[in-house]
């Protein structure tokens, strides 16, 4: 959704408030385990609130061993908890500035670059069917073409969930 709309903001606040429920961990695990997809991204908006929230995420990951989890974050304090991180969770520290180098002190990171090239995450040119369009084709697309194709999908790429991929670079948009 578009985060400027009140209905979306209200839903975000409800999700935040739900973290206080003692049923949250079990409910999240049930929902994740019921999905066909075996990858899960935490937070399309927002971040880890505090240590209790992080521990709940760890608990959900432990209850969903068949799912690979990815947690993007800008919360540097989380680094102290990396030794406790479940094996099926990749925590990527996001560099806060465009064209900033990946923080060397984190095992897995993400960066944003002002250049679009084939080394970047292909989501910006991947449509809803999973087709990855070439850079050349993308550069010729109109705004309307891009909207119709519904670009911005992962397709078959799973780099964000792969702990062997040290940094994922996203093109600025």
Identify the residue ranges that each predicted region occupies.
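Class I S-adenosyl-L-methionine
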Residues: 1-173
